[in-house]
Amino acid sequence: MAMSRRKALVTGATGLVAAGIGGTLLLRPDDVTRPHDAYFSGLNALLKREGPGHPIMFVDRARLLHNVDLIARSVGPEKTWRVVVKSLPSVPLLREVMARGATHALMVFHQPFLNVVAREFPDADVLLGKPMPVQAVRRFYADRGAERFDPARQIQWLVDTPERLAEYHALARELGVHLRINAEIDVGLHRGGLPHPGVLRGMLQRIAGDPEHLSFAGLMGYEPHLTGATSVEEPAVQAALGAYRAFVDVIREAGHDPSRLTLNGAGSHTLRLYERDDLMNDLAAGSGIVKPTDFDTALL
């Protein structure tokens, strides 16, 4: 008689348990643990001796600056390193990283952070890392103080659809402000952004039609799906660059000089892929400075 699937599964599971009990437990973790190495033992002793007695976030300044140097060297002098603020949400820490990395370019993901950046970093060049609801743009202007930071020159607002651009356009007219627009493009992630270059053409026409309130600042292509790639020659990387290049062709056809625009991409996981590629001139990274073990890969 044929054995039922359920009975076979139960029998098989019982056999595995029996084998585990009867033999050695191969999946059991080792009982022997190891002490911390000298570095972490020293930190542990320091915190026991001088720490506040509650959990803290500890940043090793020497190692942080070493990581900053590595990233700055990878980006190179011909491109802009844009520091991701959400990965380093501390004004003194940002000051240290920006000074060491010789950059004033920041990527911001949160309206309250944007207002802090405008106040604390009056010379910053800011690109929004995600499209903000139009209410957040309104709130930014409502919460502004008397700082010398000039949003019309120093912020690139990210838009991902013609509809969002229309909302931003209406707000710019209402408030009497000028918005620099950076277009989020889909380069293979398929999780937002303009799906094809034809959509960008119509948006560029709207922007060109009202230079008092709008101007075009560049492109942003988010590509975390390339995490794990080790060479710019890999097909997935080439496909992403090909998609990006098609959008660049459209902005060139519209009369823009790409070299004068922000062509942003990358992240800590993919930054080094583009060391020998000059399509993008603006590369973002932040987490790799303070979470190096997350990025301890063959590429990095």
Which residue stretches match the model-derived regions?
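A charged N-terminal "starter" segment
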Residues: 2-143
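Active-site loop/helix belt of alpha/beta enzymes
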Residues: 13, 180, 186-300
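Aromatic/hydrophobic pocket-lining residues that form the small-molecule binding cavity
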Residues: 64, 68, 161, 165, ...
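A conserved hydrophobic position in a structured secondary element of the catalytic/binding core
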Residues: 59, 160, 285
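Short secondary-structure junction motifs
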Residues: 17-18, 78, 152, 178, ...
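Active-site-proximal beta-alpha core segment in soluble small-molecule metabolic enzymes
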Residues: 83-228
